[in-house]
């Protein structure tokens, strides 16, 4: 018999319909469901695929470096980072007429180019790269790493090199190696790079392999380290009139705690960042020696979990049984990893604009907006994925006997209380926030703006004041000049920090008012509702009062036949599917808020945000409509301009988004009838009837159509907003 796709499932391979193709694609990565899979082979396959993932990442980043070196303007951008536009790569497009060629020839290039809004120029400049040759070297090195990863992946699939199951289940050793090796050693190496290459480069000293061993990063070398006078490394830092990349105003310190920003670059002090990475390295190198392996010293995680019984007996048997539950479930581990990574990605978004680490990136407004939005959306997808795999854990891996009366079992036992509390919080936030917005909207419409309900966010302002913001007049903690906290940090990082917090040209602790209060609660509504749907999906994944035997149907069942009413749309997959819409809309509100607040800040008219953000029409008219004018102008009677590509993408994004509804709102029977009619016509048309299907065409299943609809909705939604964001920001600020 011929081998048909999918090889991993003989049952599917013999399916006579097009279902074979779609179900084959859908389950290609669900190794657990493949024929002849064993637990050991499952772990080995996943392990080997990680090397493939690394190879792709290294190849991609290598491509970034290569194209900028080949077609970019890195060397001229360095001369004037604030006025030269960084080029990502050239555009070769046979459709371009003369107006298009002229519109896209920018940044000192000879032909049409794309402008880089990713921040790579600022990053490479900050870490000490200075020439195109440096970029080519980096690209080649990453290409080498990519090849190495592919070889490693292939190697670990060979019989002699396949790790055993016991190796994968050795949690303590893996933790030690990841904490010490991944985090500890890499942070130490990065500190080394910053101290030996980046900091000298910021002071006009060019360190490469040829002079690496000759140039001392600090005049006294290792002397202060060996004699215990570590404070010497912080003495004589760069002055406030230091010109980045030159010796003018430069100091000699390498590990400092200055606080605040470098006045010229508006970014964190490089010497502060080196100090930070050294501290991180120190912590993780110690943490990586915490767990007991074959040396018989350190903690055994299992012993820790078993020994800890919560006081008062209110949490049952505490953490007993958790070690094996987590260690034997790949989905539990993936869920934990995704939850952590999702939070970290969102934190990256929040911190990259408020505490910018890269030189001059704070003054590149479009890049700031693009990076914030990018990281928030990525975080949203990763976080929803955490709950998806949590639900799969409950269905495939959870063993009630093993977890009797421990914290995990008790979560399931009182899931009704958890879900109903989340539901109450969502309803409260939703009705009150919408009520305020609608009330204010009506007052504006009736011409009585003074009757709006405007609430000052006094608690948030108090927190900002505690961190040193003096605008609001709260005399508290760091904004109080006679408190112990103020006096303790006065000789160290505090002056730099306070200067940064109270200088209104950056994004650190922006002044907030009633508009912020309202949108904050709108976002809280979105977060709580998304969480409600995800948590309910995971906690009800094994069964509910309506369908106690749900776990027997797997993760993504459509219904249990026509005879059981109410079993449609209640699989854990359906909860994930619904939550993604809420996630996208919530991040929509987050990014609208961030972008509008910053546009008005950068343009110097913050009153526009303050006055218009308290009612719905303000958001629709003064943010969305007003800022889409650049897009609508991408093509006009006078020809085209450099925003045309975004105008086209804006339209195309709407098209993709709207296509999603074709899959989401019409059901399977309609498509099945349509397909049968088309097949009939096909078979009776000359020439067309010479081509026959090997598989009988059938409509997508309900679950598959939802997935396709969701994919189009998500992609269209993000494309549309990306075009809007980049065009409206770059159109204003060049």
From Swiss-Prot:
Keywords: 4Fe-4S, Chlorophyll, Chloroplast, Chromophore, Electron transport, Iron, Iron-sulfur, Magnesium, Membrane, Metal-binding, Oxidoreductase, Photosynthesis, Photosystem I, Plastid, Thylakoid, Transmembrane, Transmembrane helix, Transport. [4Fe-4S] cluster binds at residues 559, 568. GO terms for biological process: photosynthesis. Chlorophyll a B3 binds at residues 662, 670. It is found in: Plastid, Chloroplast thylakoid membrane. It catalyses: reduced [plastocyanin] + hnu + oxidized [2Fe-2S]-[ferredoxin] = oxidized [plastocyanin] + reduced [2Fe-2S]-[ferredoxin]. This is Photosystem I P700 chlorophyll a apoprotein A2. It comes from Triticum aestivum (Wheat).
């Amino acid at each position: 018999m011929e081998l048909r796709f999918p090889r991993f499932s003989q049952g599917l391979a013999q399916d006579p319909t097009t279902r074979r193709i779609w179900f084959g694609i859908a389950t290609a990565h669900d190794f657990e469901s493949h024929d002849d899979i064993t637990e050991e082979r499952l772990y080995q396959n996943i392990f080997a695929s990680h090397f493939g993932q690394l190879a792709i990442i290294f190849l991609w980043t290598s491509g970034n470096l290569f194209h900028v070196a080949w077609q970019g303007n890195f060397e001229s951008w360095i001369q004037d980072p604030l006025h030269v536009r960084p080029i990502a790569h050239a555009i070769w497009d046979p459709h371009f007429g003369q107006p298009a060629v002229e519109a896209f020839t920018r940044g000192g290039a000879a032909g049409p180019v794309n402008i880089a809004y990713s921040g790579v120029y600022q990053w490479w400049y900050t870490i000490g790269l200075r020439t195109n040759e440096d970029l080519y070297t980096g690209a080649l090195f990453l290409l080498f790493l990519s090849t190495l990863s592919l070889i490693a992946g292939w190697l670990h699939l060979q019989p002699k090199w396949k790790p055993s199951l016991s190796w994968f289940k050795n949690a303590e050793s893996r933790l030690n190696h990841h904490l010490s090796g991944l985090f500890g050693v890499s942070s130490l190496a990065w500190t080394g790079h910053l101290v030996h290459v980046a900091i000298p480069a910021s002071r006009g000293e060019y360190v490469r392999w040829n002079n690496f061993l000759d140039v001392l990063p600090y005049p006294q070398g290792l002397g202060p380290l060996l004699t215990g006078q570590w404070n010497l490394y912080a003495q004589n830092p760069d002055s406030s009139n230091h010109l980045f990349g030159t010796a003018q105003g430069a100091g000699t310190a390498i590990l400092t705690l200055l606080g605040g920003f470098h006045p010229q670059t508006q970014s964190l002090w490089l010497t502060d960042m080196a100090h930070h990475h050294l501290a991180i390295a120190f912590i993780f190198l110690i943490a990586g020696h915490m767990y007991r392996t074959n040396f018989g010293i350190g903690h055994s995680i299992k012993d820790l979990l078993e020994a800890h019984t919560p006081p008062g007996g209110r949490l049952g048997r505490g953490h007993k049984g958790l070690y094996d539950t987590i260690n034997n479930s790949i989905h539990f581990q993936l869920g934990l990893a995704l939850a952590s990574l999702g939070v970290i990605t969102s934190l990256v978004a929040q911190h990259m604009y408020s505490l910018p680490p890269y030189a001059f990136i704070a003054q590149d407004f479009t890049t700031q907006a693009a990076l914030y939005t990018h990281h928030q959306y990525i975080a949203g997808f990763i976080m929803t994925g955490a709950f998806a795999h949590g639900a799969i854990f409950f269905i495939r891996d959870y063993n009630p006997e093993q977890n009797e009366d421990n914290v995990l079992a008790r979560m399931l036992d009182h899931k009704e209380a958890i879900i109903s509390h989340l539901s109450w919080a969502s309803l409260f936030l939703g009705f009150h926030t919408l009520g305020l917005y609608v009330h204010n909207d009506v007052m504006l419409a009736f011409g009585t703006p003074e009757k709006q309900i405007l609430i000052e966010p006094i608690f948030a302002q108090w927190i900002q004041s505690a961190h040193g913001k003096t605008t609001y007049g709260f005399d508290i903690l760091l904004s109080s000049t006679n408190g112990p906290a103020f006096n303790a940090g006065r000789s160290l990082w505090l002056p730099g920090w306070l200067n940064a917090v109270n200088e209104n040209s950056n994004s650190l602790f922006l002044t907030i008012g009633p508009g912020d209060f309202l949108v904050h609660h709108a976002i809280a509504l979105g977060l709580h509702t998304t969480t409600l749907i995800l948590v309910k999906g995971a906690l009800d994944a094994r069964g509910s009062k309506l369908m106690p035997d749900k776990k027997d149907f797997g993760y993504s069942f459509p219904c249990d036949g026509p005879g059981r009413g109410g079993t449609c749309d209640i699989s854990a997959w359906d909860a994930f599917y619904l939550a993604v819409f809420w996630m996208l809309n919530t991040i929509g509100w987050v990014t609208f808020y961030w972008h509008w607040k910053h546009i008005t800040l950068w343009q110097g008219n913050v009153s526009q945000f303050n006055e218009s953000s308290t009612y719905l029409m303000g958001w629709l008219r003064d943010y969305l409509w007003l800022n889409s004018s650049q897009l609508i102008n991408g093509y006009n009677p006078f020809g085209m301009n450099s925003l045309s590509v975004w105008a086209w993408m804006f339209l195309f994004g709407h098209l993709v988004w709207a296509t999603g509804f074709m899959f989401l709102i019409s059901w399977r029977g309609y498509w099945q009838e349509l397909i049968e009619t088309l097949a009939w016509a096909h078979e009776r048309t000359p020439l067309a009837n010479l081509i026959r299907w090997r598989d009988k065409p059938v409509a997508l299943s309900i679950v598959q159509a939802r997935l396709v609809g969701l994919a189009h909705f998500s992609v269209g939604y993000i494309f549309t907003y990306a075009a809007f964001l980049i065009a409206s920001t770059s159109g204003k600020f060049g």
